[in-house]
Amino acid sequence: MAQFPLLGHGFPPEPVNHPLGGPRGLDVAGPTICPAPEEEPSRPEQVQASLDAPEHFMDEPKSTESATSPSKLPLASSHEHQDGGKPCEALQAELQGAAERVDALLVFGEGLAERSEPRAWTSLEQVLRALGTHRDTIFQRLWQLQAQLISYSLVLEKANLLDQDLEVEGDSDGPAAGGVWGPWAPSIFPTPAELEWDPAGDVGGLGPSGQKISRIPGAPCELCGYRGSQSSGQGFEDLLSLGLGHRKHLAAHHRRRLQKPQDKKRQGPPSLPDAMLEVDRGVPAPASRRPLTFLLLLLFLLLVGATLLLPLSGVPCCSHTRLARTPYLVLSYVNGLPPI
């Protein structure tokens, strides 16, 4: 819904001590606003035609307050709200009409403020603000009523479907001894994991196909075959108690499923003696010792080669240094060699 901007937001407010239509002296020093000539053709013609005689708006402030009250707008009547069977399109049409009327009042107020005296602008601005506030309050309440009507219609539709289900069950011969599913027995065929449906984890009461299912009295549990309390009544309270009991039973299954992984975690890993007992102490294969034997033999050959090569390479230098440093006697013959 389009909201038109209010006039005179930048002007200081002044007290209103006179009626809206009363004569006042012209304030020469006050601000003056020239009406914009391009705004008038932009107004809808039907709004201007419907607001040709606005004497009550200028003569009495009380008439303005009565026009802004929520009782004057065409709201949905009380008996229509109680029935809940009226379509929401009619309510939306009435809301649209009320919105157009309120917009027309706002347009008229703006035009009146442009054509009136400068001293009356503040009072007209206050009236327009009050009208806008009433408009917002009214439509906020109307949206709440519309949401309530939609919720009531959904509840009534669900109640009608439940009544139809009960009528169909009453017309039939009734379920067998084990309910509509028969006596519960564990299946011997494996169920694929992607197609498995867990009733314990079903929070919204949906079946395997994702559709809403209704709890049938006397039907066994999908997990353990528990039937719960048998009730002879078919009233709303009996159905509600059966549904709550079934939900509690499924919640107990869900809690037990959640407690199993926690118990496994609490057990913890096996201790060191247990791990030692679990180790296989058989004779290892001879192939595992071959790499170790080969490495030891290679190391031994390297040591032997080093001991053989080091003395051969160090003999000349070692003997030379040893002869140079060792003291020895030198005999010199003066008269020649001794006789032989």
Swiss-Prot record:
Coiled-coil region(s): none
Membrane topology according to the record: Single-pass type IV membrane protein
GO CC term, one of those recorded: nuclear outer membrane
InterPro entries: KASH, SYNE4
Organism domain of life: Eukaryota
UniProt keyword annotations, A-Z: Disulfide bond, Membrane, Nucleus, Transmembrane, Transmembrane helix
Perinuclear space side: 313-340
Membrane-crossing residue ranges in chain numbering: 292-312
GO terms, biological process: establishment of epithelial cell apical/basal polarity
Cytoplasmic side of membrane: 1-291
Bias kind Basic and acidic residues: ranges: 53-63
Stretch list, region Disordered: 1-86, 254-277
Domain KASH: residue ranges: 283-340
Cellular location(s): Nucleus outer membrane
Subunit: Core component of LINC complexes which are composed of inner nuclear membrane SUN domain-containing proteins coupled to outer nuclear membrane KASH domain-containing nesprins. SUN and KASH domain-containing proteins seem to bind each other promiscuously; however, differentially expression of LINC complex constituents can give rise to specific assemblies. Probably part of a SUN1-containing LINC complex. Interacts with kinesins KIF5B and KLC1.
Function statement: As a component of the LINC (LInker of Nucleoskeleton and Cytoskeleton) complex, involved in the connection between the nuclear lamina and the cytoskeleton. The nucleocytoplasmic interactions established by the LINC complex play an important role in the transmission of mechanical forces across the nuclear envelope and in nuclear movement and positioning. Behaves as a kinesin cargo, providing a functional binding site for kinesin-1 at the nuclear envelope.
Membership in a protein family: Belongs to the nesprin family.
Record comment regarding domains: The KASH domain, which contains a transmembrane domain, mediates the nuclear envelope targeting and is involved in the binding to SUN1 and SUN2 through recognition of their SUN domains.
This protein's name: Nesprin-4
Phylogenetic classification of the source organism: Eukaryota, Metazoa, Chordata, Craniata, Vertebrata
